Swiss-Prot record:
The chain crosses the membrane at residues 15-35, 53-73, 136-156. Belongs to the UPF0114 family. It is found in: Cell membrane. NCBIfam families: HI0507. It comes from the Bacteria. GO terms for cellular component: plasma membrane. It holds the Pfam family UPF0114. Keywords: Cell membrane, Membrane, Plasmid, Transmembrane, Transmembrane helix. PANTHER family: UPF0114 PROTEIN YQHA. Its main location: membrane. This is UPF0114 protein in repA1-repA2 intergenic region. HAMAP family: UPF0114.
């Protein structure tokens, strides 16, 4: 009976597969949004102010950061929780694949969130004259919370690795 339960629990990891497929659809939508932004920028590029162009490029950077985060979560999550990817050509295999454990994924996600929030905050500062001060303050506090959380998670990870090395 115990073996059946263990096999069932182990097989249930495949329930995550549709989640990763869904993330790949999300990545497709994000890619479409990226090109929509570019198509939106091109006709107005000569009339666009410098700050308008910077804001448009920040939007593209934001989409790229979220896309990179999605790829990292899809690949590393699939390899950590479902199955190793059988990529025959080692030259095409991404260098970090198979090397990220759950803690390193969490740290990368936290770092990505900090980077994404930085882009949003920079965009907010560039439009500061049209935004209420309390909204800017709230965004700064939220970003600081992200930064402190990322540092905290990295510190905990470092301490747990140090503890593991002592044993």
């Amino acid at each position: 009976m115990e073996k059946i339960i263990e096999k069932s629990i182990y097989a249930s990891r495949w329930l995550m597969f549709p989640v990763y497929v869904g993330l790949s659809f999300g990545f497709i939508l994000l890619t479409l949004k990226f090109f929509q932004q570019i198509i939106f920028i091109i006709p107005d590029i000569l009339a666009m102010s410098e700050s308008g162009l910077v804001l448009a490029v920040l939007s593209l950077i934001d989409i790229a950061l979220v896309g990179g985060l999605l790829v990292m979560v899809m690949f590393s999550g699939y390899e950590n929780f479902i199955s190793k990817m059988d990529i025959q050509d080692n030259e095409k295999r991404l260098g970090w694949m198979g090397t990220m454990d759950v803690n390193s994924i969490k740290n990368k996600v936290a770092s990505s969130i900090v980077a994404i929030s930085s882009v949003h905050l920079l965009r907010l500062f560039m439009e500061a004259e049209r935004i209420l001060d309390n909204k800017i303050m709230l965004c700064v506090i939220i970003r600081l919370t992200f930064v402190l959380s990322a540092f905290g998670m990295a510190y905990i990870d470092k301490m747990s690795k140090k503890k593991d090395n002592l044993h």
